[in-house]
Amino acid sequence: MKKKFSIVIISVLLLGYLAPFDTLLVGADETTVSEDTAVKTAEADSATEGIESETGSDDETAEEPKEAKEAEASKETTEKEEKAKTEEPASNIKTEINTDKSQLKQTSLKAAVPAGSTYNSLFPDDNLAKKLAVIITGNAAATGNESVDSAALLAISQLDLSGETGNDPTDISNIEGLQYLENLTSLNLSENNISDLAPLKDLVNLVSLNLSSNRTLVNLSGVEDLVNLQELNVSANKALEDISQVASLPVLKEISAQGCNIKTLELKNPAGAVLPELETFYLQENDLTNLTSLAKLPKLKNLYIKGNASLKSLETLNGATKLQLIDASNCTDLETLGDISGLSELEMIQLSGCSKLKEITSLKNLPNLVNITADSCAIEDLGTLNNLPKLQTLVLSDNENLTNITAITDLPQLKTLTLDGCGITSIGTLDNLPKLEKLDLKENQITSISEITDLPRLSYLDVSVNNLTTIGDLKKLPLLEWLNVSSNRLSDVSTLTNFPSLNYINISNNVIRTVGKMTELPSLKEFYAQNNSISDISMIHDMPNLRKVDASNNLITNIGTFDNLPKLQSLDVHSNRITSTSVIHDLPSLETFNAQTNLITNIGTMDNLPDLTYVNLSFNRIPSLAPIGDLPNLETLIVSDNNSYLRSLGTMDGVPKLRILDLQNNYLNYTGTEGNLSSLSDLTNLTELNLRNNVYIDDISGLSTLSRLIYLNLDSNKIEDISALSNLTNLQELTLENNKIENISALSDLENLNKLVVSKNKIIDISPVANMVNRGAIVTASNQTYTLPTVLSYQSSFTIDNPVIWYDGTLLAPSSIGNSGNYKDGKITWTNMTATSSSTLFNFNRLKDGLTFSGTVTQPYKSAAKVTADAEQTYTIGDTISEEQFLKDVNAKSSDGAPVTSDFATVVDLNTFGEYEVTLTSEKDGIQGDSCKVIVKVLHGAPVISADQTISYDKHATITEKQFLEDIHASTDLDTAITTNFSTAVNLNKGGDYTVALNSENEDGVKAETVYVTVTVNKDPAPIISAKTEITYDKFSKKTEAAFLDDIDADTNDGSIVTSNFATAVNLDKAGDYTVTLNSINSDGVAGTPTAIIVHVEKEKIATISTNTAQQYEKYAKINETQFLKDVHASINASPTTAVLESDFETVVKLDVPGTYTVTITATNEDGGVSAPKEVSVIVRKIPAPEITADKEITYPKFDEVSEAEFLNDIHATISDKNVAITSNFSTDVNLNKAGDYTVTLNATNEDGVKATPVEVIVHVQQGERPVITADATISYDKFANITEAKFLEDIHATSSDGQSSTVITSNFQTATNFKTAMSYTVTLNAVNEDGISAEPVAVTVTINKEPAAALKADAEVSYAKNEAVTESDFFKDVHLEGTEAPSTAKATSNFDSVVDRSKTGDYTVTINATNEDGAVSTPIEVIVHIEAESAPVITANAEVKYNKHEQTDERRFLYDSEAKIDEANVEIKTDFAEKVDINKVGTYTVTLTATNEDGQAANPVEVSVIVSDAAAEKVNVKYVDENGSEISAAETLTGNLDETFSIDAKSIAGYKCDATLSGVFSTVEQTVVFHYKAIKPGVVTIKYEDTNGKAVDEDKQITGEVGDDFEAEAQTVSGYSCRAIASGKITEEPQTITFTYSTATPSKKSGEITVQYVDESGKKLADSKKVTGNIDDSYSVEAKAIEGYSVVGDDSAKGVFTEKSQTVTFKYKKNTQVSKDDPKVKGKTNQPSSTDTKLKVDNNSLPATGDTENMILAVLIGFNMLIVASIFLFRKPKTNQ
C-alpha cells in the first residue's frame, strides 16, 4: 500500500499539469479535520486516474462513459473525505515516551516538579491527571493519585489527549501542569472544553498542536511563543474570533481554522515577518470580508476559504505571488474576483456555488493556471480568458445566465470543458483547442453544433437536452468515442458515419426519422435510439464490436439484415411497427431480444443464437411459434398478448433449457389442433408457465411431464379436468381461476403447494385441500358458481339437501338464502315460489385457516301449468261468437302449451243484456292446470246520427247549441241525446269556416259514429292604411316595429292593426336606404292595400378598443382566437358597432411552449374605420399539478386478492390529467392477509415534473379465541452471546394456543436484555393474533453470565520501515492481535509508543496487556518489533519515447510519456531533458533520469532514448461497396505526405456503376473513403434474321446474362438464304439488337478463320482465345475484351478481311499499377457498346479482300466444315433463348 501511494504521489508531482483538477473535491461540511488530507488524497486519485486514461486499458474501458469514471472518482474521493472526518489527520499526535532516562535531568525543567507530587496535585483537572497517569504508568486503572516526577514527564514527546465531544464528563477543561512536559513535540487537545492556553507558552519544542473542537476557546493567547510550531489546528471552535497570536510563529507551515467565527483577520508581527514559512491556510466556513493579511504571507501556496458567505471580492489577495490554489467555493456574496493578475503562480481556483458571481473577467494572463471550476454560479461574462497557456480543465456548469462562450478559444492545453446546465444558445468557434478531450454541453439551448469541428483529440461529446435540429457533419473528430445527442429536436442524423473510434451513440428522445447508413463505425458498442420516429434501422450491420442496440418506441418497419454483428448482446426494438423478425439469426453473442408491442406476423427460424437467454414477443400478431429454431440456452420466452393471432405452438423442441414461458392472453387451441398441449411436454426444465386467458384451452393433459414447474397460471380457460396436475409435485403456486372445474381431488397430494387459487369455478366440495390448509397454505376458492338439477314446485314450495362441503368434510351452512329460504338439519326449504319456471339461489362464504371458500349455488325449479287470459271481454247483443273465437278474443293460453277449454257456450247468452263469468281450464298428462275467470259483458247496439252538413251565420250572431242542433235538423234513430263542441269550436265574432262534431251514446255507453257539420261565419271589408312616406334613423339606433309605426303615424280607417316588414327589411346596423311595406288585416283576415315607406339609416362612428394587458394560459390549453379575445375581455367601447376584433394570437402564441408572447388586437368597421391597436402579453404557464380524486376509504375481506389497478378502480380513483398515471403504495403497504387499517397514498407527477397533492385512502382489511402463551420461566446465556429474539423464543419453547402461523409471539427481549452487562433481566412475552386480540403477557427471567478474561494472541514479531508512520492501533493490526475483538470488552494496551523508536534501526520488545470491564486481566504477551534500514530508491521508465519534430513538450511531459516512476514518496526524479533534447531537430537523444532520497542514497540512473522524427501521414483506405455495404472489389491504399491533398475517381467494376470522385487531406489519423456502387441490371441481346429488304426470315432469339459477360452469336442456316457471320460483344446495362442480313442463296463461298488471343507483356495467356469465321473476302473487325486488373497495350481493336489462310490477332495487356495519389485512375477500355441498339450487318461481297488466295475446292470444304462447327457451337450456347 505504501509503495502504491508513493507512486501516486510521484505521479501527482510529475503530471500536475495533466491531472484533471475538476476531480479535486474538498469536503463540503468538514469541521474537525484538516482539509488538506482529503484534497491530497483526491489529487492522488485524480493523478492515478489520469495515468490510467492516458496509457489506455482493455477494450471494455472504452465503452464506459467518462462521466461514469468521474462519478466513480468522485465517489472514491468522497469516501476518503468521510474517512478523514472520522480519523485524525496526519498531524494528529500519538503518545510517545522516551525511556532513556539517563538523558533527562531535573535541572532542565524551567519549573521544577514539587517533591511528592501526584498527578492529581500537579494537574488540577481531574480528567487530565487521570489520563496522564494511565498513559505514563501504562495502567488503565490508574486514578491519578500515583506519584509523578520530572523524568516521567520529560520522557513524553508525543501526547494524544483528545476528548469525546467537547461536552463529555471525561473531557479536559484545564491544562494547567502541561508546562512540565517540556519535551513535547506533538500535542492533541481536540474535542475538549479548554479556554486558557497559557500553560502551553513554555512548550517551545512543540511542532504540531491540535486544538480543534474546544467550544469555549475564544483566543489563542499562549501559542505566540511556540517558535518551533509547524502545524496548528484550531478548527471547529465556534467561539474563536481572533487568531492574531499566530502571526509571529516563524516556522509555522500549516494552519487549519475552518468552522470558527473569524470575521477579521489581523496578522501583525512588530518584531519581524508575519508567518514567513506558512504554505497552507484552511479558513473555510468563517465570515471573512477582507483577505489583505493573507496577501502578505510570502510562501502561502494553498488557501481554503470555502463558505465565507460575506466575502465579496478576491482582489485583496493580489499580492500573494506564490499562491497556487484558491478554494473559494460557496462564498455566496462573492460578486467579483477583482484584480488578481498578480497571482502568477496560481494553478487552481475553485468557485463552485458562488451564487452572486456574475463574471470571471479577471481570469486571464495567469500563465500557470491549470484548473478553473466555477459551477453553480451566476456567471454571465467570461471575459477574454487570454494567456492561459496551461489551462487543462474549465468547469462552468449550471450557470443559467451564461449564453456567450466565444471567449473559450486559444487554450492550447485545455482537455476538459464542462458547460452543462447553462443558457448557451450558440457555441462559437472553439478555435485552437487542440488537446480538448471532453466537451459537456448538455442541458443548454443550443440549436447548432456545426462549430464542433477540427478537435483532433476530442473523445467525449455530450450535447443532450438542447434545441438541436441537426448535428451537421461533425468533421475532423477522429478520436471521438462517446456521443450523446439525446433529448433534442433532431429529425436527421445521417451524417453519423466514418467515426473509427466511436463506441457509444445516444440519439434517443428526438423526432428522428432518418438515421442514415452509419457506415465506418468499427468501434461502436452501444447504440441508443429509443423514443423517435425512425422507420428504418437496416443500416445496423457490419458492426463487429456492437454490443447493445435500443431502438424502442419508434415507427420502425424495416430492421434490415443484422449481418455481421458478432458481439451483439442486447437488442430492444419494442413498441414499433415491425412485421417480421426473420433476420434474427446468426448472432452468436445475442443474449436478450425484446420485440414486444409490434405488428410481427413472421418470426423466422431464429437459429444460430447460441447465447440467447431472453426473448419477449408479447403484444404482436404472431400466428404460431412453430418457426422457432434451435435456441439451446433460451431460458425465458414471453409471447403473451398476441390475442386472437397466436393459435399454435408448434413442437417447441428447440428450447431444451427454457425455464420461464409466458403465453397468456392468446388463442391457443382455437382450431383444436393444439390438442392437449403435448407440444409443451418436452420442456422438462420449465419452472414457470403462464397460460392465462387462452380461452380455448380445455385439455391440459400434456402438462403432466413438467415435473419441475413451480409456478403455473391457467386462469380464464375452459378447463374441466385437472387430473394431469397430480404429477407436478414441485408446484408452489397454482392459479386455476375462471375455468369450469368441479373436482380438485387431483391436487390433494401436492405437498409443496403453498398458494392455490381456484376462484370462479364450479367447486362445491373443497375437502381435497385439507392437507394444504393444515400445513398453512393459502387457498382462495371464492366466487364459485354451481347449478343444481331442476326441481318441481308443488304448491309453491320445495326442499333440497345442502351439497357444499368444507375442507374438513363437514357441511358448510349457507351464508344467505334467496327468496327467504330456510336452512335446518342440512336441508334448505323454499316456500311461496309462485313463478311457473325460475330459479333461486343460496350463497356460502367462509374464511378460516388461510382458506377462502365462497360462491353461489343456483337451484332451478318449475311449477304446474297455469292458464292465463284477459280479465274481461265485451260483445253486442245479437253477436254470433263460438267458444273458439271467445278463447282467441281473450288471449287464452296454458303455460305448458296444453289446450285451454271453457264453459262459455253454456254460461253466456248473447241475446240478453248483462255480465257473465266464464271459467277457463287446461289439462296435460292427467295434471289439471290452474284455472282462471273471465267476465263477459253483453251490451246494446250503437245509435246513428243524422243532420245537415253545412250552415252559415252572420258575424256577432247569438246562437246556442240547442238552436244550432235545431237549425241543422240533428237527430238519432234511438232518440238518444246528441252532444257537440259548438260552443268551443265556433267563434261567431270572427269570420271563417268552423267544423263542429256531433256525438251520441246509448244507455250501455255504446257510442255512435261521429258526424261533422261545417259552420260558416261571414267576414268584414278590407281596411285602408295611412302613414308618412319616409323617415331617418341613426345607425345602431334601437327601434322596434311598434316605435317605427308610431314614428310614421301609421293607422287604418277601421282600427285594424298595421304591420310591417320593418324588422326584416331594415338593418339599423348598416347604413343605407330601405323600403318598408305596411300591411293590415282585419279580424276576419281580409287584407288592405300595402303601403311603401322609405327608411334612411346613417353611417357609424369609429370605435376604440379596450382589453386586459395580460393573460395567462396553461401549457397545451386548447385556446383559439375567439376564446383568447373573450379571456382578455377585449371589447369595443361603441355598442353596437360593425368593427370586428381581430388578433395575431394563433400565429404568435405557441401553447405547447411555455413563455411570454405579445399579441396585437385590431378592429375595423364595415365603413373602413380603423381602431387604434392594443397589445396583450400572453404567458403560457407550465402544466399545473394534476388533481387526484378518490374514495376516502375502502374495505376488503381478509385474504382477498387485489391488484393495484383493481384497487384504483375500486376507490374510483381519477385524475384531472388523463395523460398522467396514478401510482400508490398499495402493493407494498397493504397486507390483505392481515386485518387492520392501512393508509395508502396516491401520487402522480406530470410531464413537467409537477406533482399532484397526495391523496390518502384508508384501506380496511376485515377481521375470531384469545391466544394463550406458554414458555419456560427461566433461561441463562453467556455474556456477548449472539441471541436473536427468534432464538430466545425457540430456547424457552414459547408457543401460542391457537397454533396460527399469523399469531406471532413477540417480546421485549432485545430492549430488556443487555448481553454486554452480566445480570438477570425480566423479559415479557406478548402475542396478538391476526385479528388484533392480545394474549395475557408472560414473564421470563433471563440471566447473563459474566465475561471471562480475554486470551491474547499475536504474531511473535513484525517489521517496519525506518520512519514509517505507525500508530499503536496499526501495530495491533499488523501483528494480528486477537482476543479483544468484539464482543469482548477487553481493551488492549501496550508500551509500543514508548519502547519503539521508529527513526532508529533496531529490535524492540513490546508488551501487550488487556483488561475487560468485569475486571478480568489477560495474560500479557510480547512481540519483537524490527525497524529496518531504508534502501536506495528505484527508478523505472520506458526505454524510448518518440516525438514529432516541433511537437510541444517539456520535462514534465517527457516524464509522463516515458512513464517514469520511483518507489519512494517525496523523492523527485530529475533529468537532463532540457539540455540534451532539441525537439526542433530530427535525431535520437539519450536522457538520463536520476534521484536521491533524503538520506543521500542515490538511485541507479536510468537512460531513455528520445527519438525526434518528421511527422508521418497515415494511410487512406479506399473501399468499394455495393448498396448493401458489401465489398465488391479489393480495398486499396493511398499514401502521401502530411497535409497533402488526395483525389480518387471511382474505378470501373463489371456489373456496377459509380460516377464519383472523393478527395481529402492526408493527416495523422488513418482515414477510409468508400465508393458506393449501384448494381447494373443487364439488358437483353436480341438476334434478328432479316433479308436485304428488312423482312424477317426466321424467328428472333435472345441472349441473357450478367453485365460484362461475353456473348457470341452466329448467323444460322436459313433455307433459301445465305449469310455467314459471327457477332460478339459484352452484355451491357442497355438492351442491344444484332441483325444478321441474308441474301438470296447463291453457291457456297469459301470461309476464312481468325483466332483472337489475349496475353500479357510476357506472352502469358490471360483469357481463352476466340475464333471468328466469315466468307473469304468479307471484312472483319474484332475488339480487345476487358480483363480485370489489366490495361490494353497499343490498339484495342483490329480490322481486316477473311482469307483462305487462317489468321491470328493478338492483344497484349499490362498489369495495372496500384492506385496512388498521382495516378488514381485505372486505364483501359471497357469495350462496352455505347449504343443501346447495336446492329451488326454483314454484307456479302461488299467488303475489301486481304490475304492469300487458295483454290476454290479447298475453300468450299473448309467453309462447309466451319458451317457445321458453327452450327453446333451456336446451338450449345447455354444462355441463348431459342
Swiss-Prot record:
Keywords: Cell wall, Leucine-rich repeat, Peptidoglycan-anchor, Repeat, Secreted, Signal
Residue span, MucBP domain: 1510-1569, 1575-1634, 1644-1705
Location in or out of the cell: Secreted, Cell wall
Skewed-composition ranges (Polar residues): 1725-1742
Biased amino acid composition, Basic and acidic residues: 63-88
Sequence intervals crossing the membrane: none
PROSITE patterns: GRAM_POS_ANCHORING, LRR
Recorded superkingdom: Bacteria
LRR repeat segments: 155-179, 183-204, 205-227, 228-250, 251-272, 277-298, 299-321, 322-344, 345-367, 368-389, 390-412, 413-434, 435-456, 457-478, 479-500, 501-522, 523-544, 545-566, 567-588, 589-610, 611-632, 633-653, 657-678, 685-707, 708-729, 730-751, 752-773
Primary site of residence: secreted
Record's signal peptide: 1-28
Pfam families named in the record: InlK_D3, LRR_14, LRR_4, LRR_adjacent, MucBP
Keyword Nucleotide-binding: no
Chain positions with Pentaglycyl murein peptidoglycan amidated threonine modification: 1746
UniProt-listed SMART domains: LRR_BAC, LRR_SD22, LRR_TYP
Annotated membrane topology: Peptidoglycan-anchor
Compositional bias segments (type: Acidic residues): 51-62
Record domain LRRCT: where: 785-872
NCBIfam families in the cross-refs: LapB_rpt_80, LPXTG_anchor
Protein name: Internalin I
Organism: Listeria monocytogenes serovar 1/2a (strain ATCC BAA-679 / EGD-e)
Gene expressing this chain: inlI
